[in-house]
Regions:
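Glycine- (often His-adjacent) and acidic-residue-rich active-site loop
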Residues: 23, 31-63
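CoA-thioester-processing core
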Residues: 83-136, 170
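C-terminal long alpha-helix characteristic of the crotonase
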Residues: 98-103, 150-200
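Short, active-site-adjacent cap segments at secondary-structure transitions
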Residues: 34-37, 82-84, 192
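Hydrophobic/aromatic residues within transmembrane alpha-helices
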Residues: 29, 41, 89-91, 148, ...
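Glycine-rich beta-to-alpha transition loops that act as phosphate-gripper elements at the mouths
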Residues: 77-83, 136-141
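Conserved CoA-thioester-binding segment of acyl-CoA-metabolizing enzymes
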Residues: 1-30
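Catalytic-core regions built around general acid/base machinery
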Residues: 16-19, 59-71
Length: 212
């Protein structure tokens, strides 16, 4: 299992977001050891069922938009490889802690004959370092997890046995941020990019990702 975002998994995460308090606390997202996420379920994208594929894409990008704009802080414990949508999930979170290891982080879409669509481009441009935008998004460069801080995928990298401990400490610290002050500041910061992300989601088609 590589933690792919299938329609079922996207729905499960979306249901979880519905249940998390939006006026207090914080949220910690953790992947399985060795793999944070490898992105969308390619079997669905390549199944020939365009409606199912589009629904998966739109719901997946909507999920990222919700995480990105969530009223409370979200911390990611990146436990391994974070590829494609997995890397963009990191971009959606407010603080990202990575585990040392032989892991890669990055967006490999252009190296796999796929397009990085508008919602993801807008999210990534907002979170990734400007001097890495060409390398990360257009060149499809993959970064070792220990080199993923400079481009903006991660905020710190720690020993594997300390990952959850340090991520939890950070989540508890961010949970003390006052409501609604954190949320309202985030809204002001993200106002323009959220409009672009959500507008792009409405226009998503399979050919916008995988042109014939």
């Amino acid at each position: 299992k590589v933690n792919v975002f299938s329609p079922t998994m996207i729905q499960e995460v979306s249901n979880l977001l519905d249940q998390v308090p939006t006026d207090k606390g914080s949220l910690l997202i953790v992947g399985r050891p060795g793999i944070f996420s490898a992105g969308f379920d390619l079997k669905v994208l390549m199944s020939g069922d365009a409606e199912n594929a589009v629904n998966m894409l739109r719901s997946g990008f909507t999920m990222l938009s919700r995480i990105f704009s969530f009223p409370r802080p979200i911390v990611a414990a990146c436990s391994g490889h974070a590829i494609a949508l997995g890397a963009f999930l990191l971009c959606s979170c407010d603080y990202r802690v990575g585990s040392k290891g032989e892991f890669q982080v990055g967006a490999n879409e252009t190296r796999n004959n796929m397009i990085v669509p508008t919602p993801i481009l807008e999210l990534a441009k907002f979170k990734l370092a400007k001097n890495h935008k060409q390398r990360a998004l257009l060149n499809g460069e993959m970064y070792s997890i220990e080199n993923a801080i400079e481009p903006g995928y991660l905020d710190e990298v720690v020993e594997p046995d300390k990952l959850l401990e340090i991520a939890m400490v950070k989540a508890k610290d961010l949970a003390t941020l006052g409501h609604p002050y954190y949320h309202q500041t985030k809204q002001l910061d993200q106002e323009e990019v959220i409009k672009k992300i959500n507008s792009g989601i409405e226009k998503i088609t399979v050919s916008a990702i995988m042109p014939k």
